[in-house]
């Protein structure tokens, strides 16, 4: 059982506490956290980087337009399935991180747009 995790070098899959999965450019980053042992200040973790699989898909059959898309690596799917069985959904903790990043990006965008509007208004006043 848990052959995919063992192939990654995780000899004791039952020691897995949680995991996060995120996408960076053309890679998926899987970080696995282990249960904290007595006397440890921080739980141990390991990180794995998987290239995303590229596919060319037909978008419009009338114009024969194709689009390049990426999707999760097939091996990573199996690893995530095993991690889900072990953690029973504990990986959900990564969602607030994503939400916070999106909120920070949104606030930054608001500032950029507001500064641009102010700049355009100043230019208009000069006319």
Curated annotation (Swiss-Prot):
One Pfam family hit: DUF3461
InterPro entries: UPF0325 (IPR020911)
HAMAP family for the chain: UPF0325 (MF_01519)
Family of the protein in this entry: Belongs to the UPF0325 family.
Protein known as: UPF0325 protein ASA_3165
């Amino acid at each position: 059982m848990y052959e995919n995790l063992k192939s990654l070098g995780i000899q004791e899959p039952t020691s897995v506490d949680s995991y996060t999965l995120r996408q960076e450019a053309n890679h998926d980053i899987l970080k696995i956290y282990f249960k904290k042992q007595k006397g440890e200040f921080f739980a141990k973790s390991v990180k794995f980087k998987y290239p995303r699989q590229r596919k060319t898909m037909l978008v419009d059959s009338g114009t024969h337009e194709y689009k390049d898309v990426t999707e999760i690596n097939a091996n990573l799917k199996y690893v995530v399935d095993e991690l889900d069985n072990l953690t029973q959904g504990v990986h959900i903790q990564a969602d607030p991180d994503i939400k916070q990043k999106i909120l920070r990006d949104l606030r930054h965008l608001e500032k950029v747009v507001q500064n641009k509007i102010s700049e355009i208004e100043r230019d208009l006043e000069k006319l």
